[in-house]
């Protein structure tokens, strides 16, 4: 799929000109920026050659901010104003944040997204992330020597619409044009797939500082197709640090601790974890504010024991993603490890044991996502060279649908559909003279609207009054390449239209997604029975209402006995429709339908005679 770049007449770029675009890995622990230079993707370092930028921002009373290494160094003495792992807060409300009691920050539960009180005022996660992105943008422009046309920014595959929109808002605040948001595992697949020209099914296991993603990808003839995704947006290397911190506190009997001591021990815990990637044991030393000395020896065996449940927690989404993709572990050709946390020997062993093969680690796990994003950015900027023609297909994690009569869900876009995608379906009115229709946008796998997640509601007004069933309302669902959903409803006769862009106030946690999927499997039989019952009740209501209208307008076509019989059938349908037996409702509806056949024929005859009244035979010829 070649990309066509169109310029104004006389403004076409010279062949040697390149549009500067970068890939940014906006990470929980560290962030990176990369670009393609001389056809080779590379991570851009700071003035001291350091590739990683710690995702840390410290706010000062003079309303300035320190970003990166300097902020990280100051975190111990000023934990309340030094924000780390802000990615966990993107698009989240206060209720959505796990382990909030261990956080040193003063949170404000603002509408839509939490905020943090700092010495420089109240800051949102969007503003804090923008500080990091602006630093990376400046680094790139200083290194490349010109302004950027845009950036591809990576996000976890399980980021929902609110989290993705927050990321785009942060980029714009930082002065960056977002060319595309790209799933982190997919970015890694670009880096590995294109470099090695490999084809087949791959698993991308991405354990970063604060998020875990698993993607099952099929690479065939230059086409990247995501077969399934899964993960946990609240699980990462930070959780291993947190568990190790708890172990240190338990072993040294340290209670209570000040925020400064807590931050100091967290830094020591992280350093110990990283040291165990290179050696079998390490020593943890710290002097607390009280003068108390902490001196502990940590071995690989102890570390593996206290974090074993976290390692196993990553494998549950792996198993589910493989099931969704219909792939067995031995069918996976290779396993790509992404994220600094995958350097832990326990992770590499667990992944290797599960898939029965040694994971691929020939690219730096800290850099691979940024490199893939840079390659995608270079392509979107129109700089691709011959042989760089490839297509990228992502999927949505949960079905998107609309509520219909009876509280049922009509799925418009099924889960695991490739994005970008647009699907449309036509609906009609239920009552005579209906001039408005409520559109209820839903997400989930269940059959009833009450069991699915509500995303948005809006109304289409101005529908021309018609008999029930005559109006045609075309409802279009469109998911763009960034996973954002827009829904449009249009009445085809008049052209009246209404739409909504879905930006949920609160994010959807990954355990909620897993729960929704598990419930859909567990309740499948019950849901189908509930759907059948609801459908029969809707049909019963429709037929009874239509028959009642017919009696009101043409009841004189029936004898007293015939009308009594029809009304008795209607009463039976109404009574049985309150029950739970959809077979009985169906039978009663059929009986009413057949019992009014003669009435319908007489009404048709009257209608035809009325239409032909006063007209000559020659006029009909």
Curated annotation (Swiss-Prot):
GO biological process terms on file: iron-sulfur cluster assembly
Domain of life: Bacteria
InterPro entries in UniProt: ATPase_NBD (IPR043129), Heat_shock_70_CS (IPR018181), HscA_NBD (IPR042039), HSP70_C_sf (IPR029048), HSP70_peptide-bd_sf (IPR029047), Hsp_70_fam (IPR013126), ISC_FeS_clus_asmbl_HscA (IPR010236)
Gene3D superfamilies: 1.20.1270.10, 3.30.420.40, Actin, Chain A, domain 4, Substrate Binding Domain Of DNAk, Chain A, domain 1
GO molecular function, one term: ATP-dependent protein folding chaperone
Keyword ATP-binding listed: yes
Entry keyword set: ATP-binding, Chaperone, Nucleotide-binding
Keyword set includes ATP-binding: yes
Family, similarity comment: Belongs to the heat shock protein 70 family.
Biological role: Chaperone involved in the maturation of iron-sulfur cluster-containing proteins. Has a low intrinsic ATPase activity which is markedly stimulated by HscB.
UniProt-listed NCBIfam families: HscA, PRK05183.1
Name of the protein in question: Chaperone protein HscA homolog
Gene of this entry: hscA
